[in-house]
């Protein structure tokens, strides 16, 4: 899951951070985040100075947990290196559609489970491996490890893709309600 990493606790209690993975800067300002410390989870909100708001500049954004000093933050167990993720709930929309953070990877996991259930008791003339990997957003590390161990002849990745039809054009790739979207890459 994409997220943030705390890089510094400022004297005024605000937290500097960097992005982990591809996150749109303009989606950050005002967003609630969940910070995972070594002992607990805390909620904060992303705030920004005026220039950062205008320019969507992460360098001018901070996470505010309601603390007024560095010591208050440290007393909560937060330290540089802790990570944060966007705080978003799974929400059912109309017409059997959902809204959720990190839904793409979760959909892929569900599809893998559905595939295994459908193939239960079926004799295959090849070895089938189904797995879930981590760190897709920062260099495909989990997938790289899995392929290095298994050495597959073919790999099929089950993942969600962006719906591009929000632009209002009917020829966009990835339209909701228009069937399965298959993207391919041959290397």
Regions found by a protein language model. Give the residues of each.
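N-terminal hydrophobic/helix-forming segments and targeting peptides
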Residues: 1-187
């Amino acid at each position: 899951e994409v997220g943030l990493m705390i890089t510094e606790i400022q004297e005024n209690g605000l937290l500097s951070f960097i992005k982990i993975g591809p996150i749109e800067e303009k989606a950050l300002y005002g967003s609630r985040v969940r910070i995972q410390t070594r002992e607990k989870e805390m909620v904060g909100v992303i705030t920004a100075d005026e220039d950062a708001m205008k320019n969507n500049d992460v360098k001018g954004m901070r996470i505010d947990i309601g603390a007024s000093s560095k010591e208050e933050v440290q007393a909560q167990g937060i330290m540089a290196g802790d990570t944060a993720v966007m705080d978003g709930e799974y929400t059912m929309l109309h017409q059997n559609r959902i809204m959720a953070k990190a839904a793409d990877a979760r959909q892929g996991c569900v599809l893998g489970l559905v595939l295994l259930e459908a193939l239960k008791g079926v004799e295959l003339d090849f070895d089938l491996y189904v797995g879930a990997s981590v760190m897709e957003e920062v260099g495909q590390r989990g997938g790289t490890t899995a392929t290095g161990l298994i050495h597959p002849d073919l790999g099929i990745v089950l993942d969600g893709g962006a719906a591009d039809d929000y632009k209002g054009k009917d020829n966009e790739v990835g339209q909701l309600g228009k069937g399965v979207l298959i993207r391919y890459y041959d290397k």
